[in-house]
Swiss-Prot record:
Main location, first listed in the record: membrane
Keyword set, alphabetical order: Membrane, Transmembrane, Transmembrane helix
Subcellular location: Membrane
Membrane topology: Single-pass membrane protein
Gene this protein is translated from: TMEM183
Residue stretches in coiled coil: none
Disordered, as annotated region: 1-20, 99-126
Listed name of the protein: Transmembrane protein 183
Family: Belongs to the TMEM183 family.
């Protein structure tokens, strides 16, 4: 049953909309006077009405100006507390504001004190420790194993500087040299008197004399278990081939590619770094730094196009069609491939070697890496084998 509009047919009076609880009260400066200051303007008022729990600055300033005008005083002549006390008005209006300002100042002082303390602690840490002379580090370096040189150089700058000296590398060579060591002529003691390329020569000699280093290179198989990925985006510096006559009735052919690997600094986009002292630049000189040699031996001669100066972008090793040998595929392009993109074979030069007998990769310190530049620059006509 529908209900009527009200008793005796009279319409109901409109209900008055009540303000929502918890909503902030809007303040107007012209409404602030001694007669319009409400309980909601004080700190102990209902927090549901005034969420801040403190008197608004606008209200306090308006009341302050009104009190001063009633007393006939200028704002710049009499302090606020005196004007309020002279007018007989309570000064509790600004008490909460003063308390908040004092609290903010206290927080700021604690923050500044904490920063000073942390800065002082950091300075103490930076100044902690003792700096030993270079002779101490040079003496300790005489007991360092070759495989621990990197860790030793990371102790401090003085330890790193010691590893840059000619005395360090000369003592390391003498410590591991033996009379029965099988060394090439360029790595003999009489050839170690020159400072130029001393570090590189000592490292090469350790792979002949030092057993842990020699054991590393003796385990390399004829065909690597996985395709080497360190040659990606390397630049081909040289290429040559030679005929190998062995126990087989038919000779084999050895194709050599010398690559210059991309510098680790370029990979990490880091142009700076520690450089050896100027007086030891000759000791650290190494023309073959970041270079390696890819050596592929095939059962017959294969024509190879000119790839010198190009970027090596793809290297795959698969099973040959006869299922008895391997097949090597090399792709060279004019520019490197970045961002994990796959190179397109139709855009570059493709080299296919099949059938392949062995694939070996030699770093610059490997005993089988060609050291003499004369051996690398043998005149070989392109497309014709040299017998």
């Amino acid at each position: 049953m529908a209900r009527g509009p009200g008793p005796l047919g009279r319409p109901r009076p409109d209900t008055v909309a009540m303000p929502k609880r918890g909503k902030r009260l809007k303040f107007r400066a012209h409404d602030a006077c001694s007669g319009r200051v409400t309980v909601a303007d004080y700190a102990n008022s209902d927090p549901a009405v005034v969420r801040s729990g403190r008197v608004k600055k606008a209200v306090a300033n308006a009341v302050q100006q009104e009190v001063k005008s009633l007393c006939g005083l200028e704002a710049s002549q009499v302090p606020t507390e005196e004007a309020l006390s002279g007018a007989g008005e309570p000064c509790d209006i600004i008490d909460s504001s003063d308390e908040m300002e004092a609290q903010e100042e206290s927080i700021h002082e604690r923050t500044v004190s904490r920063k000073k303390k942390s800065k002082r602690h950091k300075e103490e840490l930076d100044g902690a420790g003792e700096e030993y002379p270079m002779d101490i580090w040079l003496l300790l370096a005489s007991y360092i194993r070759p495989e621990d040189i990197v860790n030793f150089s990371l102790i401090c700058k003085n330890a790193w500087t010691v590893t840059c000296t000619a005395a360090f590398w000369t003592r390391l060579y003498r410590r591991h040299y033996t009379l029965d060591a099988s060394l090439p002529l360029r790595l003999r003691p009489e050839s170690m008197e020159k400072l130029r390329c001393l570090r590189a020569c000592v490292i090469r000699s350790l792979y002949h004399m030092y057993e842990p280093f020699a054991a590393r290179i003796s385990k390399n198989p004829a065909i690597p278990e996985s395709t080497p990925s360190t040659l990606k985006n390397s630049k081909c510096l040289l290429f040559w081939c030679r005929k190998i006559v062995g126990n087989r009735q038919e000779p084999m052919w050895e194709f050599n590619f010398k690559f210059k690997k991309q510098s680790p600094r370029l990979k990490s986009k880091c142009t700076g770094g520690l450089q050896p002292p100027v007086q030891y630049e000759d000791v650290h000189t190494n023309p073959d730094q970041d270079c390696c040699l890819l050596q592929v031996t095939t059962l017959n001669f294969i024509f190879i196009p000119i790839v010198m100066g190009m970027i090596f972008t793809l290297f795959t090793i698969n099973v040959s069609t006869d299922m008895r040998h391997h097949r090597v595929r090399l792709v060279f392009q004019d520019s490197p491939v970045h961002g994990g993109r796959k190179p397109r074979s139709e855009q570059g030069v493709q080299v296919i070697l099949d059938p392949v007998h062995s694939v070996r990769l030699f770093d610059w310190w490997h005993p089988q890496y060609p050291f003499s530049l004369r051996a690398l620059l043998l005149p070989i006509p392109w497309g014709q084998p040299r017998v």
